[in-house]
């Protein structure tokens, strides 16, 4: 079996991670003691991807939980599925990172990192054939961003040929905790560009807008945002957890979605959007799901796909539905909006169907797209970064932990390069490609 090792770090990472395990335990028929109580063989067929079967037939998540303070972990432990995790896999410090990336990456986090790596190694040795890691973290704080990216680079050193998937929550002024979020996020992106293979971008701004506009919640809480995230994470990973053809492991997902190695930041969408506790009363049709899923209002990242072009995209439909109808609808979308897809990557939209729908829905769909419009989000963070950095605001918090201003400048230019690369491929046409090739041939001759 091809196992995936799940790692969650920091307050946000642990909260969305805990929700993710609640959701997938439900889907696989695992109760809160780890016993199987489901009703379908499909639930068990690929259960080993995320769970380790322990003595007495209990299923234990392949999860490592880390934080620099004990608070969030205590609440995970006392939560509904807190007893299902391996007690040794909780690794925490006492000091906290104080929303400071440098503390998470260089000082406090660096002291704790070896204990985390020990647990990661132990879990990896338990695997038959480890396919990769998935990391849940936010980029606005100190632990998830600083220590999270430190762990990613350490794992990269030790397991260079394994896939690294991240679920990264980007900060937003609308749902802001601290003033230094743009610093932390930029320093993290600098790391993720180099060390992660695929990043599912979750963006607090977009999640907030979905709760407010679509779900009509007057004051969205983090619980509401996390409900959306967990539904999306469940959808993105469903093809890894249930038998199926398309994107059945992390590497195949990457092959289908990443045309250029640095451009691995994906927008994710989900349909139908439901608020916590309310289930849909009316079954949706495939055309409605498809239409909702491609709608920019459903994207979990505050960038409008209509302002850019899709390099690649992939859709996972869940529930009992006709594959033929799914393919027709997806073709329909591409034909009607052909200007929004780059023409120089043929067959760049894939779709798959998984028979098991999420709990409480007849059918649902999840969308993962590699769109050049995601540069809007990087631009937004970059502008906030520059506004503070050119006045050297709050820098002493970072230099005091031994960082150099140079590192900020590098991170800033790396992020701006990323934006420029997205722009370059957005403007590229098939003619450019042919022209460049001809030039190269002439040079060779």
Curated annotation (Swiss-Prot):
GO terms for cellular component: cytoplasm; microtubule. Keywords: Cytoplasm, Cytoskeleton, GTP-binding, Magnesium, Metal-binding, Microtubule, Nucleotide-binding. The keyword Thylakoid does not apply. One of its GO terms (biological process) is microtubule cytoskeleton organization. Disulfide bonds: none annotated. Its cofactor is Mg(2+). It is found in: Cytoplasm, Cytoskeleton. Transmembrane segments: none annotated. PROSITE patterns: TUBULIN (PS00227), TUBULIN_B_AUTOREG (PS00228). Residues 429-445 have a biased composition (Acidic residues). Mg(2+) binds at residue 69. InterPro entries: Beta-tubulin_BS, Beta_tubulin, Tub_FtsZ_C, Tubulin, Tubulin/FtsZ-like_C, Tubulin/FtsZ_2-layer-sand-dom, Tubulin/FtsZ_GTPase_sf, Tubulin_C. Belongs to the tubulin family. Tubulin is the major constituent of microtubules, a cylinder consisting of laterally associated linear protofilaments composed of alpha- and beta-tubulin heterodimers. Microtubules grow by the addition of GTP-tubulin dimers to the microtubule end, where a stabilizing cap forms. Below the cap, tubulin dimers are in GDP-bound state, owing to GTPase activity of alpha-tubulin. Dimer of alpha and beta chains. A typical microtubule is a hollow water-filled tube with an outer diameter of 25 nm and an inner diameter of 15 nM. Alpha-beta heterodimers associate head-to-tail to form protofilaments running lengthwise along the microtubule wall with the beta-tubulin subunit facing the microtubule plus end conferring a structural polarity. Microtubules usually have 13 protofilaments but different protofilament numbers can be found in some organisms and specialized cells. This is Tubulin beta-7 chain. The lineage of its organism: Eukaryota, Viridiplantae, Streptophyta, Embryophyta, Tracheophyta.
